[in-house]
Amino acid sequence: VQDTNNQRNYMFERLDLGVGETVYGLGERFTALVRNGQTVETWNRDGGTSTEQAYKNIPFYMTNRGYGVLVNHPQCVSFEVGSEKVSKVQFSVESEYLEYFVIDGPTPKAVLDRYTRFTGRPALPPAWSFGLWLTTSFTTNYDEATVNSFIDGMAERNLPLHVFHFDCFWMKAFQWCDFEWDPLTFPDPEGMIRRLKAKGLKICVWINPYIGQKSPVFKELQEKGYLLKRPDGSLWQWDKWQPGL
């Protein structure tokens, strides 16, 4: 199909949904577990849990009829799961080709087994990583006392805890991500981590592959050519999360 307005080419497929057939999958979503009635775009975006956007989109779904479908496409795939027509799953891509695989079961476990054998299986993470994690999340003003209050709150509620995660403000604001603890709020990070580990916790910190212009190391990275550049040789920057990212 060609969009006559912009001359872009699209390919799509429609597969039948039986009466009572329910669809699951398509990666991380913050909507209903059953995907029927939803329109899903498998394009990674940082939208938060109150939106239909997600970090971990996967163009694979399975149904309670004992099969799965994997759309093998590296770009955005749009799924209409019984939303345009209740008896159809439609998926489309902006391309001149469309490749997909139907994976038989007959059970959900068998579908997932064949799917992961086909796509490849990652190494098994350590056992502790499957435990309960607690994060500072969007807390923007916190220190060791705040962290301990969160951890103590879990203990008071008799909730197990295995990993504590420091969100972005363990570093100085708008200097993300230079791997430097904010000395005002965390003057003794090594000691703090030892104290947290003494409680039997694993520690995780928030990082991302970018650096803010406000960080003291930005100039050094720029001079040494470590930063991403545009085709014309200029530095690639934007202001989405912080100035001069």
Regions found by a protein language model. Give the residues of each.
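Catalytic and substrate-binding clefts that recognize carbohydrates or anionic sugar/phosphate headgroups
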Residues: 1-127, 135-138, 144-145, 149-156
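Aromatic-lined carbohydrate-binding/catalytic grooves of carbohydrate-active enzymes
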Residues: 123-245
